[in-house]
Every structure is written in C-alpha cells, then in structure tokens.
Amino acid sequence: MGSSTDHGGAGGRGKKGSGSQLWKKALLHSSLCFVMGFFTGFAPSSVSDWTSAAVSAGGVGSSHVVRSLHATGGAAVNRSLLAQAAAGAVDAGPQPLLVVVTTTESTPSAAGQRAAALTRMAHTLRLVPPPLLWVVVEANPDVAATARLLRTTGLMYRHLTYKDNFTVADAAAGKERHHQRNVALGHIEHHRLAGVVLFAGLGDTFDLRFFDQLRQIRTFGAWPVATMSQNERKVVVQGPACSSSSVAGWFSMDLSNATSPVAVGGAGYGAAAARPRELDVHGFAFNSSVLWDPERWGRYPTSEPDKSQDSVKFVQQVVLEDYSKVRGIPSDCSEVMAKLRTVSQQLEATWRSALAIINELLRACASVHGHVRSKLDSLYRSDFPQTEPETLICLIHDHASHYIYGGRFLSGDFC
C-alpha cells in the first residue's frame, strides 16, 4: 500500500508540471502578440505608401490615377485645377502683404458718391490675390454707413476715423486727404504692419497685373500715371524714366497737346531743374518698414519738421533723393497701369456754391427738396464734366426754378 501511495504522489506532481508549462506558453504567446500589435500601430499604412510611391514614380499607378480623374466628370477636373493652383501658390512661397490706403471726402457733394465709389474699389480689390489689407480713412460723422458697407465686402480691412474738422476750402486744397494719409501711415507705423503700401483713390483705375508687380517692391516702386481731367479735356502722363527696371529720372508730358514738350529731369539726364519738387502719391509705393527706419529721424534737421514728422512728405522726399532704391513698374516703365480721374477745383467750387444757393431757396419747399436734389445730382453727373462754370449756374437755376414753381420762383434775369 505504501508503494501505491508513492506512485500516486509522483503522478500528481507530473500533472502540475504540465499545467504550469501551458500557462507559460499562453502568457508568452499573448505577450508576443501584444508587442507586435503595439509596434504595428505606429507603422504607416502600407496601402497609402504604395499609392503615393506609384504616383511619385510616374509609372503605371500614375497613369491609372490620371485616367480615373478624367473619367469622373467636370467637377473632379475643376477640383484638380484648384489643387494645382494651390500647389503653385505654395511652391511660390508666401506673398508680401499689400496695404491699400483709400482716402475719402467729407464734403456734401461727395457724400452721395462715397458708397458707390467704395463698392467699386471693393470689387477691384477682391480680384487681387491675398494677402491684402484695405485701410479706409474718413471723418468721424460718416463712420456708420461706411462701416456697414465694409462688413459686406469680404475683404480684410481697417476702418480709421478722426475728429479733426476741415473746411470746404481745406478739402479743395487737398489738406484733408493729406491728413487722412498721415492718419493711415501713423496706424501702419504704430502696429508695425509689414508690407507694401499703396495709395489708391476712389476714382483710380488699375490694371490687375499692376498688383502682381507691386509685390516685387523691396524698398520703393514708381510707375507712369495718366491723369485725366474731364473738365479741361486734358490727359497728362507723369512718371519715372527707366532703363530696364532702374529709375534714372522723371518725365511729364501732355498728351492732349501735340506741341507740348516732354519735360525730363533727374540725375541720369543732367536736368536737375526738371526734377519734380514733390511726387504724386498715386505714382509710387513703398515698403512700410521705411516708416520705422531709425535713420528717418537723423536724415533731416529739426528745422525741417515736415520732412521728418510728416510721414507722407518724408516718403515723397526719400523717393526723389535715392533713385537706386526705386524699382520701375513695369520693366522699362513702358506701360501705364494706373489712371486717375480729376475734376477741376474751379468747377468743384462752383458746384458747391450753387448747391448752397439752391439749399437756401429750398428751405421753404421741404416737400420737393429730395426731388430737386436728385435732379441736380443727375445734372452734375451728365452735364458737369463738359460745362463751363457760368453755364452750370444757369442750368442749375433753370432746373431748380422749373421744379419748384414752374419757372416762376427765380428771376429770369439771373442768366
């Protein structure tokens, strides 16, 4: 019996040993599976690797991808074109910021045209590739209407205002616009808005290629500008005289007068007397870093505060002093890409005086005030550009007297 007991104890120990071996194998197998799964999760997808490798190699995989895109229809083709354009933009690198400064007028005659002109400029700027910042400056009383308009443009903008008051005479002399430009440049300098600054008036017309040329400016850029005066039937072209993209001087010519001489001046032409005293702000652009250049304050003595503290005059002066830093736009300056439209100050003053007279006459006729004003605005747009001042006053008199009391309100001896 003792021997049988001994055999039974040996068999139990054998079963326990085999059971522990099974547990060890299962634990080892589970550990290996866990480790393999853990590291496999960090590995990239093999399918995406094969696809990208085939496309990049330009082999069979690439041809299959192209055929499938052409077979899916127009929508896929349009998306592929957009992707190609985006890829081209990425390859070209980040583009410099364009800061477009637009000034307005606070005079009564300009209030009704401001919204239409701002809308026109907004449509133009929306065609320019980003990044672009539109800086609009205007007097404080006109803020609300313009703010609503700017919010609907879809452009990145900054709306600047000021509380300074300017008379009609100051506005006609350009003092208000000059102040607005300094307000804009002060904002750019204060916030260090790095980019290329362009002054664009509400009546200006630009070639869209012009904005691509602006992004190539490193310090200063200048271009020929055609100024069209509708009232004087006159077209004057002014701008840099270039050799390739280098500026050698400045020229001015009257295209409406075939016998008018071409004035050319500058260091490259040996005619310093013809060098303009001051550049038109619509004829150049500059890198905004010039505004916070430390050399700015040491360039001019304190006896000339306009050149050191007046930002607009400072930039105008620097452009004229150093031609080597000015880039001609386009190359050879052989094309007019910016056009300005002006109205003579004499006719503007006459129009304002006539409006003041009409407003006095309409004080007792408030019910027809809006009708008469609409007729006057229509007259201004249609006849004003081709009308002499004396004739304009007579036309306004005739229209106003006719629409108030059938022509009997004013004396016919006025004209």
Curated annotation (Swiss-Prot):
GO terms for biological process: cell wall organization; glucuronoxylan biosynthetic process; plant-type secondary cell wall biogenesis. Its EC number is 2.4.-.-. The keyword Transmembrane applies. The keyword Cell wall biogenesis/degradation applies. It is found in: Golgi apparatus membrane. Residues 44-415 are lumenal. It is a single-pass type II membrane protein. Its main location: Golgi. GO terms for molecular function: galactosylgalactosylxylosylprotein 3-beta-glucuronosyltransferase activity; xylosyltransferase activity. Glycans are attached at residues 78, 165, 257, 287. One of its GO terms (cellular component) is Golgi membrane. Keywords: Cell wall biogenesis/degradation, Glycoprotein, Glycosyltransferase, Golgi apparatus, Membrane, Signal-anchor, Transferase, Transmembrane, Transmembrane helix. Residues 1-25 are cytoplasmic. It is an enzyme of class 2 (transferase). The chain crosses the membrane at residues 26-43. It comes from the Eukaryota. It holds the Pfam family Glyco_transf_43. Involved in the synthesis of glucuronoxylan hemicellulose in secondary cell walls. Belongs to the glycosyltransferase 43 family. This is Probable glucuronosyltransferase Os03g0287800. It comes from Oryza sativa subsp. japonica (Rice).
